[in-house]
Amino acid sequence: MSRLTRILPLLLATSAFVIPAANAESPKMKMTTPVPPGIATPDKLETRLGTLSSFDGVPDKATAQKVYDNLDFQRGVQAYLNSIQIASMYGMRKGILEFGPANTTALLFETLMDSKALWLTPNTTSVYMTSWLELKDEPMVIETPPNVLGIIDDHYFKYVADFGNAGPDKGKGGKFLILPPGYKGDVPDGYHVARTKTYGNWVIWRGFQEDGDPKPAVDRTKKLFRMYPLSQKDNPPKMNFINVSGKFNNTIHRMDYGIFEEINEVVQAEPTDAEDAELLGLLASIGIEKGKPFKPDARMKKILTEAADVGAATVRTLAARPREDKYYFYPGEGVWTTPFPGGSHEFLEGGARVLDARSFFHFYATGITPAMTAKLVGKGSQYAVAYVDSTGEAFDGGKTYKVTLPKDVPAKDFWSFTLYDNQTRAMLQTDQQFPGLDNNKKGLKQNADGSFDVYFGPEAPKGHEANWIQTVPGKGWNMLLRLYGPLAPWFDKSWRPGDPELVK
């Protein structure tokens, strides 16, 4: 009797080694050795996919089909979550170009942005202006106005440059030269130079009201803002400035199967080296590949349709109910969250990409710049999001809620609340043109102890009309608290806003 034969009962009894079913029925050969645990896969596996059957490591046909359906579904969901920023930029480009061609069209919200504009979580106080930059073989010049916060992001939603107050022009305005992908030509002096990896690029800038008036910022843009090819610097084409305040303007991507078609449009338009090879590989695995038509068959379209549904529910969960403490300003003690928990505009933490943070941010907001990571006392802005009340229940537009801001709100410039539609993440559309308020609002009541009570509901509470923002019965909503010029008590958390409370 061989040594293996003598010890086999002991091995089986102690489960020290796994002998696949097929091998157990096979004759013991001269070269047979024990198989260390964890290497062999049992011929029958009970999983969330059901029973997976194999013959000594080779799945049967039914199992193979089941596994491939699952693999395609998994990759569809991950492609959705990891590419939502690409679809978002597709939506932005489409929304801008509906008003006119790239490079010569600028959209201006001359009397501010209201809820007719479907943009991701804008505010109601900045003077928004935007254009789409399309490069070809030569550099493009952008002449920028002073005193703005401006960003250029590429077609894959990656940072290209800042201009204005956070840019190299230091808020004075200037000439920027944007070099196209692969450009190796001369670069003239006299420009702030930036290189982009994509042909399509989003240009967005925010001006500031002066004594409550947006007109000075608008006038400076009309006078100074230009985009043109470098070869036309001596005779640049005229810009077409379009006032889109009060007009319907959709820049938001789809959340259903159509999101994959939107992502495909960007992949087809841009160089392959403009995006991470791993992500492009993930997209290729579901049929989105540069130079090839995206035409999933009936089976694959059904799988991707379900993947989009699960992806949509997943990213909405990431935004509304984050599960990690780092998304909460007061973990375990309050509902206020941040859509940007890290210190990197590339969503890096400890050398790793924080995937949920990237998905959450690009689902909820827009605009990428290193400046967003700055936490400067008395400068910039800070944002706190609430999707649920103090008990963890989603906001119901048919009910009334209250948020109390304790005295000495730590905002050097001003503070504001804005309400957003859970579905679109754009401003909530009500009878109020601007679904928000700030501390500069006329008639805003302050309590005797210096605190403020702000109300949210379908009807104004009697005596608190100036402190009220309207909601819509039958609809949910979420809110953003913004602090402009945030002060030290915000950062050290010695001051904190009250949680939204249901008013009974």
Predicted feature locations:
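Bacterial N-terminal signal peptides
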Residues: P9-V18
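Residue-level detector of alpha-helical transmembrane segments in integral membrane proteins
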Residues: S2, A13, P27-M29
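A compositional/structural signature for long, glycine/proline-rich flexible linkers
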Residues: A24-K504
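Absolute N-terminal positional cue centered near the fourth residue
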Residues: L4-T5, T14, M92
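Bacterial N-terminal signal peptides that target proteins for export
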Residues: M1-P9
